[in-house]
């Protein structure tokens, strides 16, 4: 929920600021540290399906009672076992795509296909030894369970004079990581995330009819579920959005041209010139924030934090509000403070994770 809250703020920034000053949006790709860290010598991994065969699931939905005068026409929820074979394949494919391990081997056939009743069970050390030896790997990542909660909702959208048919699936995979030399799993992951589909129609029946078919929904939900644990296991590339001030003076406008030409050093010189050459706190704040983005692009996160802090303090002076003391301040009151504060928080988080990321990437001699 916090993620969507921040994104909503960013959208509001553009509306609040664009009328009185120029902002330009750029994209940035950066590597995010994983929750887990593995020794560099662990280079070959097997992704296995440690479950029994997935039963032929049919959605047995429980329909909710809808309140009177509600825009919701109908809502039903079902709980099902997800297809772990599909999830295992998706997990292996996504881990291989990150190019972190030298080799990724997949064993998507259910290891406990002979179980008479579906159950969750950890691998014994003997089983781990045998799997690692047979597959020629250093560690085992096992998909051991997958639960799905599917909610189907049909509602009337008054502002668009139409009906929406939506399917929201929350996926709960269970993944365990095994090392041959350990008698118990190294760790157990219980991540979760949601995937969403929607269709529209002139009537409730039309919207419901156009909703994603159950078979396709279960397939795509299982594929999605397989990708959920990846960021906990290996470093992943993340795409972010940054904002640059591009107006207010000739150097700032010229610097924006350099950014479009990917000449960041030239842009930095002009931003620094703008920062040092003005007494206007607003212009200093704009230049400081741009310089923070420059240092982030150069992977100098400590310096990026330093300049973002300067921008935040200047924004606080400009807007004569201190959000930490005035909990009723809104984005309309302090748009620059919110913009600089959100960016500073993200930079600090990135910088705090840098030692862990460097340790995780030491297998590549810090070449990342």
Regions found by a protein language model. Give the residues of each.
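Long, contiguous interaction/recruitment modules in multidomain scaffold/adaptor proteins
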Residues: 86-95, 101-247
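Conserved hydrophobic helix-helix packing surfaces used for dimerization/oligomerization
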Residues: 44-47
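Bacterial N-terminal signal peptides that target proteins for export
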Residues: 1-9
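C-terminal/domain-edge helix-coil "capping" segments
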Residues: 21-42, 178-284, 291, 297-368
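C-terminal motif of bacterial Sec signal peptides marking the signal peptidase cleavage site
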Residues: 16-19
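N-terminal segment of the mature soluble domain
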Residues: 51-142, 182-187, 320-322, 326-360, ...
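Short secondary-structure boundary/capping segments
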Residues: 2-3, 61-64, 157-158
